[in-house]
């Protein structure tokens, strides 16, 4: 019970990472949406951006009284992962796998120009497991994204289901890998 009280007092933390191919949409639109969300729910923002946009975002979050950490590069990304409740990212396979492994629920906004739509396919795998949310950049509307964030933050039940499904997915994948390795060893002998 004490842990629950501590957890409730901590600000809901949203991390925004554009990935190696960057994400102008993350810099150009999300900060405005997050400012609106912060009017009804206190949140903390961790935001990766470009050097050219860093000061703008720092000042924006300060002016809107949003607790924040804006950075260009973070040497120890695990430090951030451990403090994050929700991740907003593209759909890179390694990023999504790492978030899955660490059981960090995420919203994926796949890069629409990715080759063979692979970022969408990566995110769709997790969505099919009911362990993430996908937002299509081509149909991105500020109000819809704001509504989604508020729903995620307020509806702890859905959020916890996604988190639990990530945990179950990793448990299943671990046993599948162990079984495949054992079969491989047995077949060699």
Task: Show which residues each predicted segment covers.
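Donor-nucleotide binding loops and adjacent catalytic segments primarily
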Residues: 5-87, 120-123, 135-145
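Conserved donor-nucleotide binding/catalytic region of nucleotide-linked donor-dependent transferases
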Residues: 6, 133, 138-172, 188-189
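Short, amphipathic alpha-helical "lid/cap" segments that border enzyme active or binding sites
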Residues: 31, 142, 146, 175-183
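Short glycine/serine-rich donor-binding loops of glycosyltransferases
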Residues: 77, 95-103, 108, 122
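Short hydrophobic beta-strand element within catalytic cores of glycosyltransferases
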Residues: 89, 105-116
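Acidic, glycine-centered active-site loop in nucleotide-sugar glycosyltransferases
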Residues: 103, 120-132
């Amino acid at each position: 019970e004490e842990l629950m009280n501590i957890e409730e007092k901590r600000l809901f933390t949203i991390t925004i990472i554009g990935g190696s191919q960057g994400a102008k949409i993350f810099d150009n639109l999300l900060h405005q949406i997050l400012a609106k969300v912060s009017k009804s729910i206190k949140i903390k923002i961790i935001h990766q951006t470009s050097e050219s946009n860093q000061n703008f975002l720092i000042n924006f979050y300060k002016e809107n009284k949003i607790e924040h950490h804006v950075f260009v590069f973070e040497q120890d990304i695990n430090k951030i992962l451990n403090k994050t409740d929700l991740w907003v990212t593209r759909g890179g396979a390694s990023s999504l796998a790492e978030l899955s492994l660490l059981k960090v629920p995420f919203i994926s906004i796949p890069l629409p120009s990715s080759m063979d739509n692979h970022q969408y396919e990566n995110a769709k795998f997790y969505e099919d497991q009911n362990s993430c949310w996908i937002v299509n950049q081509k149909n991105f509307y500020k109000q819809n994204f704001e509504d989604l964030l508020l729903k995620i933050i307020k509806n702890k039940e859905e959020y916890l289901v996604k988190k639990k499904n990530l945990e179950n997915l990793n448990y299943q994948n671990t046993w599948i890998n162990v079984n495949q390795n054992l079969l491989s060893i047995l077949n060699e002998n």
